[in-house]
Amino acid sequence: MSLTETPICNFGEKAQSFNLLSTNNERLTLNNIKGKNGTLIMFICNHCPYVKAIIKYISEEVIFFETLGIKSVAIMSNDIKNYPEDSFENMIKFSKLYNFSFPYLIDSTQEIAKKYKAVCTPDFFAYNKNLELQYRGRFRELKNMQTDKK
């Protein structure tokens, strides 16, 4: 996925269900990962310079969200033939490198990304406790942020 204009948030839209493989070799569903007070679904990948620029901050924020009862999950939907850096093996390495405290799932058919209408990486979808969309968009302004060289 490339940098594109994020569509307007359709407030109240329900989260789409999924059943995907995590980097811990577990199949996880939306019901498995939803939080008591909310759920953050992030579409990311390993090779994206924008993801690399903010991944440390994402990891830190997710820990804070957890204290609020908000669970987080990241989904990688890129075609690994076109982006070998995003392979499942590299997802495992990436999640360990950045100490992910949240599940990192592979969507190898892009079915889930299409259901969510994810258009770029990173693309964030924040839901309330009833899994109704409250925010859709970017993490924060990316101007002047440097790519992590790890």
Predicted feature residues:
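Chalcogenol-based redox active-site neighborhoods
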Residues: 1-150
